[in-house]
Amino acid sequence: MKTTFLDFEQPIAELEAKIEELRFVQDDSALDISEEIRRLQKKSQALTKDIYAKLNAWQVSQVARHPQRPYTLDYIQGLFTDFVELHGDRAYADDAAIVGGMARFNGEPVMVIGHQKGRDTKEKIFRNFGMPRPEGYRKALRLMRLAEKFRLPILTFIDTPGAYPGIGAEERGQSEAIARNLYVMAELQTPIVCTIVGEGGSGGALAIGVGDRTLILQYSTYSVISPEGCASILWKSADKASVAAETLGITADRLKANGLVDRIIEEPLGGAQRDWDAMFQSMRRALTDTLAELRKQPTEAMLGARYQRLRAYGSFKEAPAR
């Protein structure tokens, strides 16, 4: 797969293009230019490290949306075995923007649920661009209740711009479906680990995001609204998205500092999209550690702590009047 570079990665793209050109020349000639290729590769790695060390919030949001990042089904293939996908909400339809089913993680049975985006135009439309409708959240809820019945830990993967705002979705009870999930997830008597792997967009993310631990990838985001949406409301222009991104505090480090996430999972150099295998290894370590920790907790203590976590969302302090 040819790497897609973002706007701020253009210096890296130019170096990588030069490296590819030299590889082509080397294959078609007797010249040995391997040393020059290695030099440029080191330069590219150093440049990537330098650029990614200075990313602002708006640039991080662009990385979180990168079209080549692993999606839920990719993590399922890379981390789990014996996956059996379960379909439908048993009330209206099967929403392809939410995928889920039973699987084994390190040999132990679990329930996996997550948002799913598409790669090409046809799949994006089929997956509704990762924006679930009410039936998607009701499907997720059905699987969670099934997990509780069989005492299966629940692992959710969050990556959505938000819940689908269409008229049909609203008529079928979008807000009720999200609220119902929050209500039920707060009381499920089984461990829940939520991992933000891309965009964590508003209630669409929170509807499968109430858990005992919330993990986030280094270059993922979590927010009540997209930077563009916030800018359009406050400044009447999406051009202020970069300002909105900084103000919203959507990045992993800000979220960790505010107590909204528990652990930041380090991504490979250049983001998860650059090395899926390395990302899967980091994810496996994080999930293994987190599940081992939760299994030691008594159920009542776990539920009490989970409820307090949910209640703490949106807490604030009043500043002195000026």
Swiss-Prot record:
Transmembrane segments: none annotated. It comes from the Bacteria. Gene3D superfamilies: 2-enoyl-CoA Hydratase, Chain A, domain 1 (3.90.226.10). Its main location: cytoplasm. Coiled coil: none annotated. Keywords: ATP-binding, Cytoplasm, Fatty acid biosynthesis, Fatty acid metabolism, Lipid biosynthesis, Lipid metabolism, Nucleotide-binding, Transferase. Residues 39-293 form the CoA carboxyltransferase C-terminal domain. It catalyses: N(6)-carboxybiotinyl-L-lysyl-[protein] + acetyl-CoA = N(6)-biotinyl-L-lysyl-[protein] + malonyl-CoA. It is found in: Cytoplasm. Pathway: Lipid metabolism; malonyl-CoA biosynthesis; malonyl-CoA from acetyl-CoA: step 1/1. PROSITE patterns: COA_CT_CTER. The keyword Ribonucleoprotein does not apply. The keyword Transferase applies. Disulfide bonds: none annotated. GO terms for biological process: fatty acid biosynthetic process; malonyl-CoA biosynthetic process. Its EC number is 2.1.3.15. GO terms for molecular function: acetyl-CoA carboxylase activity; ATP binding; carboxyl- or carbamoyltransferase activity. One of its GO terms (cellular component) is acetyl-CoA carboxylase complex. Belongs to the AccA family. This is Acetyl-coenzyme A carboxylase carboxyl transferase subunit alpha. The gene is accA.
